[in-house]
């Protein structure tokens, strides 16, 4: 639900899963066949996992990080992992790159540029749940285009500030 001032978008677990399923249908509807999925950790891990299961494709993971200040709302320096993690083999063929959103577009553009330099990748497309109007990168597949740039409150963010002590309090009788 988008707030009246357009600055915040709150997403429930049910909405989140429905959006990932809609993303899967968009990808399937395109008719594009791909060999592997590369998800960006952390935001792309949940969508990547679901898409890996739905399409029955191997899942690789690349860690990225850019949100640093102001409770994670101010983008800082972009860090890309040196290595891509996958169970076997190498990242090769037709790759679907998955993240949760294209915010500024900086992360996706940097990863795409890096992947295009890998000779083992023959084709690359990208998929996200949300893309913002301010993004400098437009993914091949997305579910919602947000004309403004709201902060998206995803359902798993409740764990960002939850520590074991707080979790234990939930189960005290």
Predicted regions and their residues:
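PRPP-associated nucleotide enzymes
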Residues: 1-173
């Amino acid at each position: 639900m988008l707030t009246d001032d357009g600055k915040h978008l709150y997403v429930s677990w049910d909405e989140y899963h429905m959006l990932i399923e809609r993303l899967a249908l968009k990808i399937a509807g395109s008719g594009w066949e791909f060999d592997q999925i590369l998800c960006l950790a952390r935001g792309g891990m949940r969508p990547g996992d679901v898409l890996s299961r739905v399409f029955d494709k191997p899942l690789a993971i690349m860690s990225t990080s850019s949100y640093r200040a102001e409770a994670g709302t101010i983008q800082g320096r972009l860090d890309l992992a040196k290595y891509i993690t996958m169970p076997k083999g190498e990242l090769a063929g037709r790759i679907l790159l998955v993240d949760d959103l294209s915010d500024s577009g900086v992360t996706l553009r940097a990863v795409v540029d890096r992947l295009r330099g890998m000779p083992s990748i023959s084709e690359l497309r990208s998929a996200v749940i949300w893309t913002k109007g301010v993004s400098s990168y437009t993914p091949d597949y997305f579910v919602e285009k947000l004309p403004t740039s709201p902060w998206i409150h995803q359902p798993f963010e409740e764990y960002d500030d939850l520590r074991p002590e707080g979790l234990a309090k939930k189960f005290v009788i």
